[in-house]
């Protein structure tokens, strides 16, 4: 047992040292922070359990070093420590709860910039030197390069001695621009900023648009009582401080702190710079000293780290998938990578034009994102190891029919394509449509492959007890499937209409139809028999354009689609849905809304549901076609955009009467 533990500790040390060099020296990390931290925690766990195997060279006693031989090493005036970190909000709250504020709650919150740490030393108001963090005791002297950063004042108006910590960064936009011209592109903006700062020729550094935020005033405690006062002084002296830093005191609660963190987390994609978390610090300098330090980090600060929104992986193969509309979508099979809290092994490539634009082929190393919890997608090629780019095949992979191009996408035109058929059934059963419980993609594919079902109507005629002969299907499971099918017959007509998969017909358009007295199968069918009259009628409805109008008319003249509707009508499905709009609710009926901010006592989802039930239509983003923006506390960028577009603003008080 002891030899196994020793070996695991030795292996962990070796691996962590390798990663430290990649991160701090080479600026080319091969693993995400989350993976690195997991290995550090495992090493700490083993060393705590078996202290006899803990050595003085353990990575848990130190933090990584960015020292390079190209620059002179200079000793810091005081240890430049790292930050303790958590990935869980409950752990963050526990850290806050443990601090004895002595009835004087004070804490600051600011984004954690993903850049290159720097320490600035001012003597009598003059920038004397600039050092990298290095190993915390010694740093590389990069003063000559730092002097080229326009946002760092070389001379101050006051003759003061300062020791400041800041984060040198490069904006997302400039990262993409610069990376295009580099022979060896960087994987992220942090590595690029770090690489630029360490260039030997300062004239080269001056050509790059480096930026900086000052986030710590290391000798502020000698002059100020709290961090907010010190920060105000820094601004007055001409230093750039992140405008998103916020100070909380007795008037605030921990809940408000957590809400602000949630707000930053939500908006991080809109920032011009990369952030990898949020930093919390005790504001009171006297309390900081009482809380003290470890050899690694101050006890008065904590970083809440985000799980990675993107990762880097190699494309092993590319397959094409056929959707319910026949659309051909290329998908990359990639090495497993951890992104946004999940391991992913595949990512969409959108379409042929997109593949061509990024020059992607099998074997390339790519950046993969999973922003907003959507389907993982390949963002860009990081390292090109192939020639040319992948080409979508000329024929559908499922039925071999020649594909046709419509806009940016290729489509399989065969209505009887097996892939199209099975995807339509999956869509019909999905949560947003008929929500037929128990019918997973796996079960639907199984039923289709065994030729038990060929379309959604077969779900209502198939004898499910035939499944008893197959492994995994027993009476209870089969009865649950049958009960789910029966329950689906009671779903409202809007759900059935959505489930039919009419191209571009979504929930909002269906609501518009219903609000304009087109709220039944018979009304829609009758209207669409006169194509020209139907087209002009539909175009009169605000929010319905030519494309959607033509798709609706085509659907209600398609024999296959009509046979499906007749089938469901014979099974006594609901073929009409009453939309009652009284005089009081006419303001909402058919109007397009968006919502932003927080609302005391109400979640946004509850407000949306209640207003939808009274005829409102909700968009997820602010566009020129919006009628109203509902604004709560701590409204974000949506409010700014709405004001620029002259969109009417509604407060919580304006809509409160509609929520009863």
UniProtKB/Swiss-Prot annotation:
One of its GO terms (molecular function) is DNA binding. It comes from the Bacteria. InterPro entries: BRCT_dom (IPR001357), BRCT_dom_sf (IPR036420), DNA_ligase (IPR001679), DNAligase_adenylation (IPR013839), DNAligase_N (IPR013840), Hlx-hairpin-Hlx_DNA-bd_motif (IPR003583), NA-bd_OB-fold (IPR012340), NAD_DNA_ligase_OB (IPR004150). The keyword NADP does not apply. The active site is at residue 112. It holds the Pfam family DNA_ligase_aden. Residues 583-660 form the BRCT domain. Keywords: DNA damage, DNA repair, DNA replication, Ligase, Magnesium, Manganese, Metal-binding, NAD, Zinc. Zn(2+) binds at residues 396, 399, 412, 417. It is an enzyme of class 6 (ligase). Transmembrane segments: none annotated. PROSITE patterns: BRCT (PS50172). One of its GO terms (biological process) is DNA repair. NAD(+) binds at residues 33-37, 82-83, 110, 133, 167, 281, 305. Belongs to the NAD-dependent DNA ligase family. LigA subfamily. DNA ligase that catalyzes the formation of phosphodiester linkages between 5'-phosphoryl and 3'-hydroxyl groups in double-stranded DNA using NAD as a coenzyme and as the energy source for the reaction. It is essential for DNA replication and repair of damaged DNA. This is DNA ligase. The lineage of its organism: Bacteria, Pseudomonadati, Spirochaetota, Spirochaetia, Spirochaetales.
């Amino acid at each position: 047992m002891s030899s196994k533990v020793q070996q695991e500790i030795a292996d962990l040390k070796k691996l962590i040292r390798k990663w430290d060099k990649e991160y701090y020296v080479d600026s080319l990390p091969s693993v995400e922070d989350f993976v690195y931290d997991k290995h550090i925690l495992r090493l700490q766990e083993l060393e705590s359990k078996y202290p006899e195997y803990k050595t003085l060279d353990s990575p848990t006693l130190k933090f990584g070093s960015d020292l390079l031989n190209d620059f002179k090493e200079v000793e810091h005036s005081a240890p430049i420590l790292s930050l303790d970190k958590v990935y869980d909000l409950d752990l963050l709250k526990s850290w806050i709860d443990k601090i004895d504020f002595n009835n004087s709650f004070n804490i600051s919150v600011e984004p954690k910039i993903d850049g290159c740490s720097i320490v600035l030393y001012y003597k009598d108001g003059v920038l004397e030197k600039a050092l990298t963090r290095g190993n915390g005791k010694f740093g590389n002297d990069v003063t000559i390069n730092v002097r080229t950063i326009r946002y760092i004042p070389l001379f101050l108006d006051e003759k003061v001695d300062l020791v400041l910590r800041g984060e040198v960064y490069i904006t997302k936009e400039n990262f993409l621009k610069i990376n295009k011209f580099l022979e060896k592109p960087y994987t992220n903006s942090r590595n690029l900023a770090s690489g630029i700062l360490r260039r030997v020729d300062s004239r080269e550094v001056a050509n790059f648009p480096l930026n900086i935020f000052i986030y710590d005033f290391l000798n502020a405690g000698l002059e100020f009582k709290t961090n907010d006062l010190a920060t105000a002084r820094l601004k007055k002296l001409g230093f750039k401080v992140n405008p998103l830093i916020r100070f909380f005191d007795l008037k605030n609660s921990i809940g408000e702190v957590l809400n602000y963190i949630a707000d930053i987390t939500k908006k991080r994609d809109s920032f011009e710079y990369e952030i990898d978390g949020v930093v919390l610090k005790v504001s009171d300098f006297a309390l900081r000293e009482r809380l003290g330090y470890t050899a690694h980090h101050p006890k008065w600060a904590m970083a809440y780290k985000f799980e990675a929104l993107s990762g880097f992986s190699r494309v092993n193969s590319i397959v094409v998938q056929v959707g319910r509309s026949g659309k051909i979508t290329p998908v990359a099979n990639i090495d497993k990578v951890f992104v946004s809290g999940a391991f992913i092994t595949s990512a969409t490539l959108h379409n042929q034009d997109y593949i061509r634009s990024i020059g992607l082929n099998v074997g390339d190393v790519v950046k993969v994102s999973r922003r907003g919890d959507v389907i993982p997608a390949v963002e860009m090629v990081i390292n090109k190891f192939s020639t040319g780019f992948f080409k979508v095949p000329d024929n559908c992979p499922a039925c071999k029919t020649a594909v046709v191009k419509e806009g940016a996408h290729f489509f399989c035109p065969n209505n009887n394509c097996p892939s199209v058929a099975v995807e339509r059934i999956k869509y019909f059963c999905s949560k947003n449509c008929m929500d037929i419980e128990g019918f997973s993609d796996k079960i639907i594919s199984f039923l289709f492959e065994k030729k038990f079902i060929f379309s959604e109507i077969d779900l209502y005629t198939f004898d499910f007890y035939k499944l008893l002969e197959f492994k995994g299907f027993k009476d209870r499971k089969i009865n649950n499937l049958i009960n789910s099918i029966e329950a689906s017959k009671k779903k409202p007509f809007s759900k059935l209409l959505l489930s039919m998969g009419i191209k571009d017909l979504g929930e909002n358009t269906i609501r518009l139809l219903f609000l304009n007295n087109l709220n039944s199968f018979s009304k829609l069918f009758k209207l669409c028999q006169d194509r020209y009259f139907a087209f002009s009628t539909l175009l009169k409805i605000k929010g319905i354009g030519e494309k959607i109008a033509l798709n609706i008319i085509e659907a209600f003249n398609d024999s296959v689609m009509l046979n499906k509707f007749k089938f469901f009508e014979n099974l006594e499905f609901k073929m009409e849905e009453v939309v009652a709009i009284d005089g009081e609710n006419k303001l909402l009926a058919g109007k397009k809304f968006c919502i932003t901010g927080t609302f005391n006592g109400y979640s946004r989802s509850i407000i949306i549901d209640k207003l939808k039930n009274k005829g409102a239509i909700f968009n997820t983003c602010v566009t020129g076609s919006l009628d109203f923006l509902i604004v709560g506390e701590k409204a974000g960028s949506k409010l700014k955009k709405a004001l620029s577009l002259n969109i009417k603003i509604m407060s919580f008080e304006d809509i409160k009467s509609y929520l009863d």
